[in-house]
Every structure is written in C-alpha cells, then in structure tokens.
Regions:
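Hydrophobic cores of alpha-helical transmembrane segments in multi-pass inner/ER membrane proteins
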Residues: 1, 66-82, 148-161, 218-238
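Alpha-helical transmembrane segments of multi-pass membrane proteins
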Residues: 26-44
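Perimembrane loop-to-helix junctions flanking transmembrane segments
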Residues: 41-61
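Short aromatic-rich membrane-water interface segments that cap or initiate transmembrane helices
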Residues: 54-66, 135-149, 210-219
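Interfacial helix-start motif at the membrane-water boundary
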Residues: 55-75, 103-107
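C-terminal transmembrane-bundle signature of multipass membrane proteins
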Residues: 177-252
Length: 252
C-alpha cells in the first residue's frame, strides 16, 4: 500500500528537479576547499615529522576518524537505499521512471566531480608533495586526504548511484549493467591498489615517478570511470523508449 501511495504521489512531482544535485555539488566543493585550506596551514606546521606530537593531533586523528566514518556511511547508504527500495517496479509510470532517470544522472554528476577531486586534484597534489618533502611515513598529510578521504568519498557516492539505479529504476533492476559495474567498481579498486603501491615503495621502488610501473594500477582503474559513457547511453536508450518516436522527434 505504501509503495502504491509513494508511486502515485511521485507522479505529481517535477520530472526535472536539480536541487539535490546542486546541494550535493555545493557541499562537496565547499568541504574540499576547507580541506585544502587545512592542508595548506597544517601540512607545513604539523605534517613534516610523523614522530612529532602535533602530527598525531592534526593528522593521525583525521585518519582514525575518517576510515570508520566512511565505512559506516557507505554501508548505511547502501542499506537505506535497499530498505526503502521500490518493491513494485512494474507499477512505476513512465513519468516517474523519467524522473528517476534524471535523479540518477544527478548522482552521476556528483560522482564525476568527486572523482575529479580524488583521482585528479588531490592525486596530482600528492606528486607535488613528493617532489617537495622527504617523507618518513606512508601516512603523509597528502595521503591521509588523498587515499583515505577523497577515494572513499567518491566510492561511497558510487555505491549510492549504483544502488539507486538497482532499487528505483526498472531498466537497471532487470540485471547488472556491465558499464555501471565498471564505473562503480573500477575507481574503487584504486583503494586496494594503494596497499600494493605503499608496499612497493617500501621494499621495491622508492622513487616517486608517476610513470613507474608501480603506479600503473592507478591509471588502469582510474580510466574505468570512462564506463560512465556506457551508462549514459543506457539511460538515453531508456529515455528514447519512454518518450517514443513522437516525443523523441520533438527533441531533434
């Protein structure tokens, strides 16, 4: 009964409502700007000697806080999306399905920006840090933000977008989209690759060359984010099917 009521009430909502996306983007960007300012201030003041008490205060405290918080957030988001899933997807109207497809696109936009911050901005920044500072720990200020904050954050958003599609959209609920699996799991696999990377730098290859074979895993898994184009093609195909020939003709 609740599912039917939810579906019926959703029909009255707007098909295109971008407020969620703008709120998500604003929150993400403001958060990372604050993080970047924090890095600039305390990276030099308290981030050069891992044995100093201030390093424990300003940096390791972040590490021990962010890891369990991100894990709980990812599991909680997936659990909530599954618990509140639409159990009668066959009753979803074309208009409501279109609204949900638009919402999925918004998830993907926020995911793309999160990947930019993690896999581009903070990753390139880490290269600058290595060229400037001789590190005495694997948990440098740059790594604490890059590996253990920005990567898990975009992974949590990937989990959200994947579970949203699987639990709300009939097309993606029919099976597993290979493109969606690639775009969601590929960049996430950079995180276990971090372990290989740090082990390699400790016992094998200490030079921080970005073109070194030890770093190829970052590129391989990072480029899997391009699977988003496959997901977009699937979304557009479904939009075309919902609109029909007459509706599609109006857009050309």
């Amino acid at each position: 009964m609740s599912t039917v009521t939810t579906t019926a009430s959703a029909v009255e909502s707007k098909v295109v409502d971008l407020r969620g996306m703008w709120i998500g983007l604003a929150t993400l960007n403001v958060f990372y700007l604050i993080v970047r300012i924090y890095e600039q201030v305390f990276g030099w003041r308290a981030g050069l000697d891992s044995f100093a008490p201030e390093f424990q205060t300003y940096w390791m405290s972040i590490l021990w806080t962010e890891i369990p918080l991100e894990l709980v957030s990812g599991l909680g988001l997936a659990g909530w999306l599954w618990k509140t899933r639409d159990r009668n997807l066959s009753a979803v109207t074309p208009r409501e399905e279109m609204r949900r497809l638009v919402t999925l696109v918004q998830w993907l936009v926020v995911y793309a920006v999160a990947i930019y911050w993690g896999a581009s901005f903070f990753t390139e920044q880490d290269g600058t840090w290595h060229m400037t500072v001789i590190r005495d720990t694997d948990f440098t200020p740059s790594h604490i933000i890059e590996f253990y904050m920005s990567y898990p954050i975009y992974s949590v958003i990937a989990v959200g977008s994947f579970f949203y599609a699987r639990t709300r959209i009939p097309y993606f609920a029919q099976g597993y989209s290979l493109a969606f699996l690639i775009v969601a799991i590929g960049p996430f696999l950079i995180i276990p690759n971090v372990g290989l990377n740090e082990w390699g730098h400790t016992f094998w290859f200490r030079e921080e060359l970005f073109v070194a074979p030890l770093h190829w895993g970052f590129v391989f898994f990072g480029w899997m984010a391009l699977g988003v184009f496959g997901v977009v093609l699937q979304i557009l195909g479904r939009v075309h099917a919902i609109l029909g020939k007459e509706g599609s003709a109006l857009l050309t």
